[in-house]
Amino acid sequence: QFTFNEAISLEVRVSGQEQLDQVWAALVEGGEELPCGWLKDKYGLAWQITPTEYYDLLGKGDPEADSRLMSAVLKTIGKFNIAELQAAYKGS
């Protein structure tokens, strides 16, 4: 029997916390939350639900802010909180 693992995953880019929350809730039902904005659905397939705001911040070219953002990402268990990612990026 074939089982999924993290060697294959799908990314869904969402815009805003409301859309992130909706997509997350639909996919995680019967599955499990994982670190760094990842989840496994009820079939064991890994998903990363990523807000477009994350990529907007990374594209600004500030290495120190990028480092703070990545630190916040690595500390996240379950879904992202966009306001927390933005605060980490700003250093607040």
Residue ranges and their predicted role:
Residues 1-92:
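Glyoxalase I/VOC metalloenzyme domain signal
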